[in-house]
């Protein structure tokens, strides 16, 4: 209902994709776009975005090995109240693939995935949630730096 309401009112859409496969959200974006246009809004003003968990490092294996325990601990904290089984490395590794919801790894990997999401959904916005699991401040600052200096130029320049 919130997708329809936002579209009818001409409001922007931001979808949190924090698990599973992003492609499963495609019908929401299609519904929003159709309803937005059918409601008479200007296509040039349509804004759609994705919010996703992200974390970057210079080396994929190193950042993944360091970040996984923190991320898993947070997912387990959330999952306990929801009856989820413990978060596994397989889930994390799948999440990092093109078909998964995580944007974790080297800058080129993250940029490629943002471009894939943009092209798949017609995105105009992307929000990276980088502090999931409470990484060390220096690691978080490095992730933000890499996002700004390495990912953004690729995404904006495309």
What is each of the regions a protein language model found here?
Residues 1-3, 57-59, 135-137:
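Short catalytic/ligand-binding loop motif for oxyanion handling, primarily in non-cytosolic enzymes
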Residues 1-22, 29:
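A conserved active-site cap/scaffold subdomain adjacent to cofactor or substrate pockets
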Residues 19, 54-56, 132-134:
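Active-site-proximal loop/turn and secondary-structure-junction residues that shape catalytic pockets
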Residues 14-16, 49-51, 127-129:
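A cross-family glycoside hydrolase active-site/sugar-binding cleft signature
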Residues 25-33, 136-157:
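C-terminal helical cap(s) of enzyme catalytic domains, especially alpha/beta-barrels
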Residues 107-147:
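Long, low-complexity C-terminal extensions of enzymes
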Residues 23-124, 156-158:
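An alpha-helical appendage that flanks or caps ligand/catalytic pockets
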Residues 7-8, 119, 153:
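Solvent-exposed polar/charged
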